[in-house]
A protein has these predicted regions:
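Short active-site loop/helix that positions an aromatic residue
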Residues: 116
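Extracytoplasmic cell-surface/polysaccharide-interacting catalytic and binding patches
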Residues: 18-104, 119-200, 209-225
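Bacterial Sec-dependent N-terminal signal peptides
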Residues: 1-23
Length: 225
């Protein structure tokens, strides 16, 4: 009997591990719905509807990204309610300068973080660690740049989005004064409005207070229902 019980619990543990081999249990749709009933601040907001003139260029809904694969089935940008509110304030500040926001990525389902980690073979210099989950998984991170409001043209930045090189680091000196000004303007306005730039990516901004929000594993199709 003891052997049978031991075998049974061992098999159960194997099933649990195979379902979540990195030890993170992202909340799913029903848990998310329950969480926003108790705390409306946890709601995911559609940024395209919430922020006037925002531009979406969701690269993970295309093959134009470092994986060379289409990761998302829909080109959507969601963020938690206070994140969206802070971004709308930043958009108003950028508008005074003649700029608008272009979003490359916002909320990211946990499954995408696992995919990126495995593509990078465990190197977490430029992708998140699935043993912890990412700020994107919490709806509290944004990948973005600036565009000219009059033309929609992107401002020149030190590198392309998702360029995995030291030139992408916000701390890296930039010789071109216009490019340096563009990068520094993006960072200063975002940090004024409650975000923190990521140490290795000039385009990545974490909402200050992201720790209060759970890792989520909800697909965009579910959010759109």
């Amino acid at each position: 009997m003891k052997i049978l019980l031991a075998t049974f619990f061992f098999q159960l543990s194997l099933v649990a591990f195979s379902q979540n081999k990195y030890g993170v249990k992202p909340i799913l749709l029903e848990q998310y719905k329950a969480s926003i009933k108790s705390n409306p601040e946890k709601e995911l907001v559609d940024l395209e509807k919430f922020i006037p003139h925002i531009v979406l260029d969701i690269r993970y809904a295309t093959t134009n990204n470092f994986t060379k694969e289409k990761i998302y089935n829909m080109a959507k940008a969601y963020a938690r309610k206070p994140v969206a509110a802070a971004l709308r304030k930043a958009q108003a500040d950028f508008k005074k300068l003649g700029y608008g926001i272009k979003i490359y990525d916002a909320y990211r389902p946990y499954s995408a973080t696992v995919k990126f980690y495995e593509v990078m073979k465990g190197d977490t210099t430029y992708v998140a660690n699935p043993y912890k989950g990412s700020r994107h998984n919490r709806g509290c991170a944004l990948d973005m740049t600036l565009v000219l409001l009059k033309t929609g043209k992107e401002l020149q930045m030190p590198t392309a989005w998702d360029a995995m090189q030291k030139a992408s680091w916000p701390s890296t000196p930039v010789a071109n004064p216009e490019v340096r000004k563009n990068r520094d303007t993006l960072i200063s306005v975002m940090e004024k409005n409650g975000f923190k730039v990521y140490t290795t990516e000039w385009w990545h901004f974490d909402f200050v207070g992201w720790e209060k929000f759970e890792v989520m594993g909800i697909d965009f199709e579910e959010l759109e229902k």
